[in-house]
């Protein structure tokens, strides 16, 4: 198939209010274009001054998504990977903080020849260079760039000016702006109001940018009359006003946009003439499984520190959707605030009533740790399927050391610097690290699985690669003692020094992992550990409390017998 010669740029902006779903829109459009045979990548530009979100509170930023190459990025990159089934990288997320840092570093090195460093041209030129970087280095047909924030925010202005200039540089056939807005429904008046969208476009016009396509979020589908009115007052044809009403699941958005012919409008405006018909049968089948599970429902408790803000666990929640579809069940998540178990009078048995699996979530710091440990003990002693991720695995280690091995003072040096029995300790190469940002063990690392373990059966192979984000690890001084008491170290680093996965002998499904499996779960390839965990919860819910998870639950075939994985 013939390919367009130039990389086409699509910029997605948002107006009226935040959290309209620019990330889902970008990912959905990317999926539609990829299904037509085009090579697509997506990147996110965030206007905040932080260099990256790695040190930001989950309450402010939500989940920090980690890429294979160790970038700490915005959670929207998770949507990009889940929808496109393509890896993102350090180059896929740019913050205004990183832009300013690059400009200041160049000034210190004398690259501006003593000139006055200003937003225009120096900051804008730096942004434009970054905008072209991924397009030049990747083999692409289309590059989609989501600009964070809302039109009218001061922080976003340099990004918008760079986009305006880039359109002049590349030409109107090579750069397109899609503006996402809100058309609210006023119940008292029984009508939709277009004025917020009109004002949002007016503010965008003030920056010198005329949107090429409007996507209008709404509670209900837009009528033709509403589309015509919006187009009339925003300088657009009716066909360039796309409706996007509320969906039962975010995975229904690509199908809705396909019905609205967004991809066709984009192809026409960018002059892309060679493409195939979209192939999304697998996506439609997945959505049907999500909406209409054949085998009922399972409830999984997620015990964490940030449960008041579910976006802190975005990839975990989406992994449950993927795994639920594979197992033909709906996964209902019951959030449990880990600090609740530390309060007097808390009844863990009541909190875990009708729960079929427990996931102890990742996090940092000592708040709520004893609560997590209490819930883990309940799951271990009652044969409830358990999955601990990162901090969850470390808490499981502490619980086992205290209550099975008799190490009453077992703890992590993260929570108690002078603890007498540090079963979890700071990694050796971290002990001299003083800076916080970007200094953890980050990115993808290999792990070797022990034969005939739960992990080995779930993955169906012996060598895996998973993404990490941590400073602390299992202390090998206690390895022999815990192993003698029934803990199984089913996954380690290739040299055997780092414990990556723990299991407990005799428990039907108890797995703790130092890495973050949720970062690699996809619509087309649900993560094996989540699939196995949900399968175990399903068996527990339906009365098979002595489940032994078998690899044929996944379409992976027989476990491989080589380290090549």
Curated annotation (Swiss-Prot):
Reaction(s) catalysed by this chain's protein: UTP + L-glutamine + ATP + H2O = CTP + L-glutamate + ADP + phosphate + 2 H(+); L-glutamine + H2O = L-glutamate + NH4(+); UTP + NH4(+) + ATP = CTP + ADP + phosphate + 2 H(+)
UniProt keyword annotations, A-Z: ATP-binding, Glutamine amidotransferase, Ligase, Magnesium, Metal-binding, Nucleotide-binding, Pyrimidine biosynthesis
Binding of L-glutamine, residues: 59, 363, 391-394, 414, 471
Positions annotated to bind CTP: 18, 153-155, 193-198, 229
Pfam families: CTP_synth_N, GATase
Domain of life: Bacteria
Binding-site list for Mg(2+): 76, 146
Residues involved in UTP binding: 18, 193-198, 229
Pathway the protein contributes to: Pyrimidine metabolism; CTP biosynthesis via de novo pathway; CTP from UDP: step 2/2
Matches recorded under SUPFAM superfamilies: Class I glutamine amidotransferase-like (SSF52317), P-loop containing nucleoside triphosphate hydrolases (SSF52540)
A GO biological process held by the record: 'de novo' CTP biosynthetic process
Residue numbers annotated as active site: 390 (nucleophile), 516, 518
Modulation of this protein's activity: Allosterically activated by GTP, when glutamine is the substrate; GTP has no effect on the reaction when ammonia is the substrate. The allosteric effector GTP functions by stabilizing the protein conformation that binds the tetrahedral intermediate(s) formed during glutamine hydrolysis. Inhibited by the product CTP, via allosteric rather than competitive inhibition.
InterPro entries in the cross-refs: Class_I_gatase-like (IPR029062), CTP_synthase (IPR004468), CTP_synthase_N (IPR017456), GATASE (IPR017926), GATase1_CTP_Synthase (IPR033828), P-loop_NTPase (IPR027417)
Disulfide bonds: none
GO molecular function, one term: ATP binding
Assembly information from the UniProt record: Homotetramer.
HAMAP family with a match to the protein in the record: PyrG
Further comment found in the protein's record: CTPSs have evolved a hybrid strategy for distinguishing between UTP and CTP. The overlapping regions of the product feedback inhibitory and substrate sites recognize a common feature in both compounds, the triphosphate moiety. To differentiate isosteric substrate and product pyrimidine rings, an additional pocket far from the expected kinase/ligase catalytic site, specifically recognizes the cytosine and ribose portions of the product inhibitor.
Known function: Catalyzes the ATP-dependent amination of UTP to CTP with either L-glutamine or ammonia as the source of nitrogen. Regulates intracellular CTP levels through interactions with the four ribonucleotide triphosphates.
Family: Belongs to the CTP synthase family.
Name of the protein described by the UniProt record: CTP synthase
Record organism: Chlorobium phaeobacteroides (strain BS1)
High-level lineage: Bacteria, Pseudomonadati, Chlorobiota, Chlorobiia, Chlorobiales
């Amino acid at each position: 198939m013939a390919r367009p010669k130039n990389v086409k740029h699509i910029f997605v902006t948002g107006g009226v209010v935040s959290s309209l779903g620019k990330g889902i829109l970008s990912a959905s459009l990317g999926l539609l274009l990829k299904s037509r045979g085009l090579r697509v990548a997506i990147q996110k530009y965030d206007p905040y001054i932080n260099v990256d979100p790695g040190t930001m509170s989950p309450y402010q930023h939500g989940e920090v998504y980690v890429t294979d190459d160790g970038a700490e990025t915005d959670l929207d990159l998770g949507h990009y990977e889940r929808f496109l089934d393509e890896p993102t990288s350090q180059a896929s997320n740019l913050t205004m903080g990183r832009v300013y840092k690059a400009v200041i570093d160049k000034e210190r090195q004398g690259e501006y020849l003593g000139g006055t460093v200003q937003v225009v041209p120096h900051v804008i030129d730096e942004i434009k260079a970054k905008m072209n970087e991924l397009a030049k280095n990747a083999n692409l047909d289309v590059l989609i760039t989501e600009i964070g924030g809302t039109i009218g925010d001061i922080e976003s202005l340099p990004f918008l000016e760079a986009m305006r200039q880039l359109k002049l540089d590349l030409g109107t056939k090579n750069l397109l702006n899609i503006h996402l807005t809100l058309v609210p429904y006023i119940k008292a008046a029984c009508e939709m109001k277009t004025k917020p969208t009109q004002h949002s476009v007016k503010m965008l016009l003030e920056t010198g940018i005329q949107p090429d396509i409007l996507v209008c979020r709404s509670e209900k589908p837009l009528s033709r009359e509403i589309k015509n009115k919006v187009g009339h007052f925003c300088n657009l044809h009716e066909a360039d006003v796309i409706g996007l009403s509320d969906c039962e699941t975010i995975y229904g958005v690509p199908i809705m946009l396909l019905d609205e012919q967004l991809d066709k409008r984009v192809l026409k405006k960018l002059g892309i003439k060679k493409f195939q018909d979209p192939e999304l049968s697998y996506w439609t089948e997945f959505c049907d499984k999500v909406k209409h599970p054949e085998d009922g429902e399972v409830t999984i408790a997620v015990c964490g520190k940030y449960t008041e803000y579910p976006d802190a666990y975005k990839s975990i929640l989406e992994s449950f959707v993927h795994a639920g579809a594979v197992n033909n069940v709906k996964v209902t998540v019951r959030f449990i605030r880990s600090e609740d178990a530390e309060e007097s009078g808390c009844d863990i048995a009541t909190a875990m009533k009708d729960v079929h699996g427990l996931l102890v979530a990742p996090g940092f710091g000592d708040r709520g740790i004893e609560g997590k440990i209490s819930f883990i003990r309940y799951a271990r002693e009652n044969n409830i399927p358990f999955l601990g991720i990162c901090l969850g695995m470390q808490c499981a280690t502490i619980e086992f050391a205290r209550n099975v091995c008799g190490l009453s003072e077992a703890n992590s040096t993260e929570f108690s610097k002078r603890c007498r029995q540090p079963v979890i300790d700071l990694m050796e190469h971290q002990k001299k690290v003083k800076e916080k940002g970007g200094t953890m063990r980050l990115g993808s690392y290999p792990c070797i699985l022990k034969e005939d373990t739960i992990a080995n059966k779930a993955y169906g192979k012996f060598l895996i690669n998973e993404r990490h984000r941590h400073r602390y690890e299992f202390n090998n001084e206690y390895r022999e003692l815990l192993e003698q008491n029934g803990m199984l170290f089913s996954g380690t680093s290739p040299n055997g020094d780092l414990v990556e996965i723990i299991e407990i002998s005799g428990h039907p499904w108890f797995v703790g992992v130092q890495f973050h499996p949720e970062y690699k779960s996809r619509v087309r390839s649900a993560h094996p550990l989540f699939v196995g965990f949900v399968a175990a919860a399903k068996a527990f819910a339906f009365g098979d409390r002595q489940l032994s998870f078998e690899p044929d639950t996944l379409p992976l075939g027989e476990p491989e017998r080589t380290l090549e994985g």
